Regions:
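SAM cofactor-binding core of SAM-dependent methyltransferases
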Residues: 2-53
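N-terminal Rossmann-like NAD(P) cofactor-binding module of classical short-chain dehydrogenase/reductase
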Residues: 5, 66-68, 109
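Feature marks short, surface-exposed loop/turn motifs that line or immediately flank catalytic pockets
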Residues: 13, 33, 75, 116-117
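Active-site flanking residues adjacent to catalytic metal/cofactor-binding acidic residues
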Residues: 27, 47, 69, 110-111
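Class I S-adenosyl-L-methionine
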Residues: 55-64, 76-171
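Short glycine-/small-residue-rich Rossmann-like dinucleotide-binding loops
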Residues: 72
Length: 171
């Protein structure tokens, strides 16, 4: 059976959507979503992923085959100030990369808004570089913007992405 864990877990949408996965743990800080997670699922909530000891606590548990995160989108959204990685919330994305590299799960799924593809500081290129093990931020193949779908290879991993619109999936 595939095992999984979630970061920035919210109310547990991945856990609900994929009941065949053996969920090992989650990480959520907000009070209401944490209460929902506790009521619906029996796996531990490791809390704040920015805590200095988070990686050690995660490594002390069974490693997941699948790691899913929906890091905060406000710093990347076109509806916001677009501070990107200059915003603490945007930097949680880079913390996610640190966690991925420490845990090294076979499969990683990251959810965010399309605005992350075209920030002034190339946040998506920084994210991809961290995931695939590149030594510098990656840059889009054509033009100044990342495409809505693509794949990159790096020294440590391969990453693919695609923009999907939830309205077309009955959500």
């Amino acid at each position: 059976m595939m095992t999984g864990a979630t970061l920035c877990s919210g109310i547990g949408a991945p856990e609900q959507a994929m009941p065949w996965v053996e969920w090992q743990w989650c990480a959520e800080t907000e009070k209401f979503p944490s209460a929902v997670l506790a009521a619906r699922f029996d796996h531990p909530n490791l809390g704040d992923i920015t805590a200095p000891d988070f990686i050690d606590r995660a490594l002390s548990l069974k490693p997941p085959d699948l790691l899913i995160a929906g890091t905060p989108c406000q710093s990347f959204s076109i509806a916001g100030l677009r501070r990107s990685l200059a915003d603490d919330r945007g930097n949680i994305t880079l913390r996610f990369v640190e966690i991925v590299n420490a845990i090294n799960p076979p499969v990683v799924l990251w959810e965010n808004v399309p605005g992350v593809l075209n920030t002034k500081d190339n946040a998506f290129g920084c994210f991809l570089a961290g995931i695939v093990g590149a030594s510098a931020p990656l840059v889009p193949a054509r033009g100044r913007r990342w495409s809505h779908a693509g794949m990159v290879d790096g020294p440590k991993a391969r990453a693919a992405w695609r923009i999907l619109d939830a309205q077309y999936f009955g959500l």
